[in-house]
Amino acid sequence: MKSQIFFAVAALFLLTVRTYASKSKEQDLRDALFSAMFSADNQLNPQERECRYWLGTCSKTGDCCSHLSCSPKHGWCVWDWTFRK
């Protein structure tokens, strides 16, 4: 009887230790993700945007790819009737 109680208490202790360890790993992972998301490095180095393709939204012709121009009526990149290689 004493051995059964001892094994039950030991099993509960091991389960508690295992749960605590997994929670600590989860917290470390959460902290790492938050620091990566909110780091200032991403804000200081903006990336250059690609050109907009046919029927992509634009505000000026420079937003569109080389063979397209921005239509002032609709604000879309449309073909400018040129042929290039």
Swiss-Prot record:
GO molecular function: ion channel inhibitor activity; sodium channel regulator activity; toxin activity
Keyword Secreted: yes
Entry's Gene Ontology cellular component terms: extracellular region
InterPro entries given in the database record: Huwentoxin-1 (IPR011696)
Signal peptide positions (record): 1-21
Keyword Zinc (UniProt): no
Family, as annotated: Belongs to the neurotoxin 10 (Hwtx-1) family. 18 (Hntx-VII) subfamily.
Protein name, per record: U5-theraphotoxin-Hhn1a
Organism annotation: Cyriopagopus hainanus (Chinese bird spider)
Organism placement in taxonomy: Eukaryota, Metazoa, Ecdysozoa, Arthropoda, Chelicerata
